[in-house]
């Protein structure tokens, strides 16, 4: 492990943000406030006071496709009714309307700015997600990524609640040969402006190959490595990969997951979902549910017929939404 120590404030401000203590249950509404920026300590996240923190929350769908869910009422509902303490802003890079594919960059950056503002006002953490998908090798749009994260880190260096996720789901990209060198370059851009922000790095095979990180970690003491799972597809073998990584001292963050199959559709596997949830809570691993949308697919948290963009009742939520609301509430 690269000398990771928790509790050092490292220049992070101490304005209140919010965090949920690892494995806490029954906290209901608002999560326990945490002080200051997040630090990696061993495999755990800690707040500026050194208390263990588990983030639990929700990811948007693509910002270009479902921008209406980036609003204060939506985030407030997630915080107060679901008990969420983090929201992830998923900005696709290569898909239709994507940042690197002719999308409206200024509109996308404005949505991110709105999302950061609402989260900050509500005392929540917020993840800025460079959502690579069809561009499976993160180096494909590396220069764009470096410029984007330099701009974001410069803009939000005064915030201690902003988390940077630099490559959502790499594929066919070797950790040592492709992803790690990319991460080193992008992280150095962020660190020019912000020495202490938490940075999340995706892993190969749609962020499943976290085993490749052990012994090959990045030389930065506030990085976590990303695992994504869809409980209908990913079961015991991926859970054991997670446990092995944690046991090797690799800090893991689940920035996206759901309880259906990996297409985001299909049936729900409640048994596998519960096994995942038990493991995440047992090990204090942070997790975010995909996705805050009413898309007609199993993983969407809102019913397809519901046009409300906040203030949802249980009846407005899909089966997946109801399950995650309880999971996040603890």
Model feature map: region roles:
Residues 71-135, 142-147, 151, 155, ...:
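Aromatic-lined substrate-binding rim segments of carbohydrate-active enzymes
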Residues 3-12, 19-86, 102, 322-330:
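N-terminal carbohydrate-binding accessory modules
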Residues 32, 136-138:
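Membrane-targeting and insertion segments and their boundary/processing signals
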Residues 8, 16, 20-22, 53, ...:
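A ubiquitous, low-specificity "background" feature that marks scattered single residues
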């Amino acid at each position: 492990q690269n000398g990771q120590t928790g509790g050092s404030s490292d220049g992070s401000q101490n304005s209140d943000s919010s965090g949920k203590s690892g494995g806490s249950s029954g906290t209901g509404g608002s999560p326990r406030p945490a002080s200051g920026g997040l630090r990696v300590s061993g495999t755990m996240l800690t707040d500026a006071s050194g208390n263990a923190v588990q983030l639990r929350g929700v990811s948007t769908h693509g910002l270009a496709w479902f921008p209406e869910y980036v609003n204060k009422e939506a985030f407030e509902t997630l915080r107060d009714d679901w008990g969420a303490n983090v929201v992830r802003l998923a900005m696709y890079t290569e898909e239709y309307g994507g940042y690197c594919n002719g999308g409206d960059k200024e509109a996308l950056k404005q949505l991110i700015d709105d999302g950061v503002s609402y989260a900050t006002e509500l005392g929540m953490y917020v993840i800025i997600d460079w959502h690579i998908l069809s561009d499976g090798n993160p180096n494909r749009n590396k220069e764009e990524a470096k410029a984007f994260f330099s701009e974001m880190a410069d803009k939000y260096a005064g915030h201690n609640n902003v988390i940077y996720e630099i490559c959502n789901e790499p594929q066919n990209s070797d950790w040592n040969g492709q992803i790690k060198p990319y991460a080193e370059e992008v992280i150095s851009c962020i660190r020019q402006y912000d020495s202490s922000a938490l940075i999340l790095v995706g892993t190969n095979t749609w962020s499943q190959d976290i085993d490749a990180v052990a012994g090959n970690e990045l030389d930065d003491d506030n990085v976590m490595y990303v695992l994504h799972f869809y409980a209908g597809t990913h079961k015991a073998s991926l859970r054991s990969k997670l446990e092995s990584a944690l046991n090797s001292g690799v800090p893991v963050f689940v920035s996206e997951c759901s309880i259906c199959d990996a297409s985001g559709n299909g049936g729900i596997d409640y048994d596998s979902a519960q096994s995942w949830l038990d493991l995440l809570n047992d090990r204090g691993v942070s997790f975010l549910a995909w996705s805050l949308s009413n898309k007609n697919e199993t993983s969407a948290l809102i019913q397809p017929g519901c046009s409300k963009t906040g203030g949802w009742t249980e009846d407005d939520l899909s089966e997946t939404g109801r399950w995650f609301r309880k999971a996040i509430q603890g």
